[in-house]
Regions:
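Single conserved hydrophobic/aromatic residue that forms the stacking wall/gate
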Residues: 1-16
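N-terminal propeptides/leader regions of secreted preproproteins
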Residues: 14-94
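Non-catalytic tandem-repeat scaffold regions and their flanking low-complexity/translocation tails
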Residues: 53, 64-74, 79-86, 94-141
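Functionally critical loop-and-helix segments that line ligand-binding/catalytic clefts
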Residues: 142-154, 295-342
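Substrate-binding cleft of extracellular glycoside hydrolase catalytic domains
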Residues: 145-267, 273-275
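Hydrophobic anchor at the start of a short beta-strand
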Residues: 205, 278-280, 302
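Structural recognition of alpha->loop->beta junctions
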Residues: 227-241, 245, 292-315
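Aromatic-lined carbohydrate-recognition surfaces of secreted/lumenal glycan-active proteins
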Residues: 272, 276-289
């Protein structure tokens, strides 16, 4: 989501391939190194007699084909035939399986193999214009509830196409608090359009407020601002307190400690409840672990952002699994979420 926040959220070993020097490779003067081939007589071409081959087989000396050095020249047609007869089947068994991409069903489970890696995909994926979710083992999961989140930075959406892609809900930014000492409350200029169009397309709706509250009073003001904009309109999903770093890393609340940030989140959520709505808190895994006390927020809906994984690493009601999805109905990249509560 292109709101005011940071998406931030070797020792490289250089391998030098050392080729073993071929004793028969041409030297700089054009002659062969250790040129013993010129000393061969016709009888030298036959290295082993059939009797010697049989003795070697009986003793196990030829058990490992890769360890043998048999001169398979045109003169040794018999040995070439014998070598292929002995070890040909083994070579066939060791041929790698052909690369595969696309959908595949194995033991009653459905997987999708990526075209670029030929490996099973995991996590949230958009494939041929439809959203899918694959668990950590690459198994496609059914009955998944997909949603997106949007703000003024996403415009020109075709909500009917978005719904057909598998999206059933949207979380819309209702507003934010500005920079500076004043910290004015601002309604997202695209909120009404997004809200109306999403409803008309039959999508369920929730909202979030990008907070920069530095104390509990400001957090309550933000919640009251959300209720004022909604003006009694019903929601299907919570009003989320969005806490994260500002885009310029110089936001009013960026320097808050864990205790103060947690108090702001609680004050916001309690005021949302007082206004008759369901409250929730949005943050990344890092923030839930380091910047805010998750244990004190578990009575509220938790919306966790964590990308490039097969699922949320913390318990939550909603998981934002990617910010780079591409789906029909929107020309750019967009956040996609999974709701675990329907």
């Amino acid at each position: 989501r292109d709101r005011l926040r940071s998406r931030g959220l070797g020792d490289v070993y250089k391998r030098q391939e050392l080729a073993a020097q071929d004793p028969q490779a041409p030297a700089a003067d054009g002659t062969a190194q250790n040129d013993t081939t010129s000393q061969h007589t016709p009888e030298d071409s036959v290295l082993l007699t059939p009797e010697q081959i049989q003795q070697a087989l009986d003793s196990g000396a030829l058990e490992d084909a890769e360890a043998q050095c048999i001169d398979l020249t045109d003169e040794n047609g018999f040995f070439r035939w014998l070598f292929n007869w002995l070890f040909g089947s083994k070579a066939k068994e060791e041929e790698p399986a052909p690369a595969y991409s696309g959908w595949r069903t194995e033991n009653g489970k459905t997987y999708y193999y990526a075209q670029d890696t030929n490996k099973k995909v995991t996590g949230l994926r958009s494939i041929d214009g439809k959203l899918y979710y694959f668990d950590a083992n690459g198994v496609k999961q059914d009955n998944v509830t997909f949603g997106i989140d949007v703000s003024k930075y996403q415009s020109g959406l075709d909500w009917n196409k978005i719904k057909k892609s598998g999206v059933s809900f949207v979380i819309i930014r209702i507003g934010y608090r500005g920079y500076g000492a004043a910290g004015n409350l601002v309604k997202d200029p695209m909120f009404e359009e997004h809200f109306t169009n999403a409803r008309n397309a039959g999508l369920k709706v929730g909202v979030y407020f990008f907070s920069q509250a530095v104390n509990e009073n400001e957090a309550r003001e933000e919640a009251q601002g959300c209720a004022y904009v909604l003006n009694g309109r019903k929601l299907d999903y919570p009003i989320y307190f969005d806490t994260e770093a500002s885009g310029g890393k110089n936001g009013r609340a960026d320097g808050l400690g864990v205790e103060d940030r947690t108090k702001c989140a609680i004050a916001f959520c309690e005021e949302v409840k007082a206004q008759g709505y369901q409250p929730g808190v949005y943050a990344s895994t890092l923030w839930f672990r380091k910047r805010i006390d998750l244990n004190r927020l578990k009575s509220y809906s938790i919306w966790n952002a964590h990308y490039n994984v097969a699922g949320s690493p913390i318990a939550c009601d909603m998981w934002q699994g990617t910010c780079t999805a591409r789906i029909p109905g929107y020309g750019g990249q967009i956040d996609v979420n999974i709701s675990y509560v329907g």
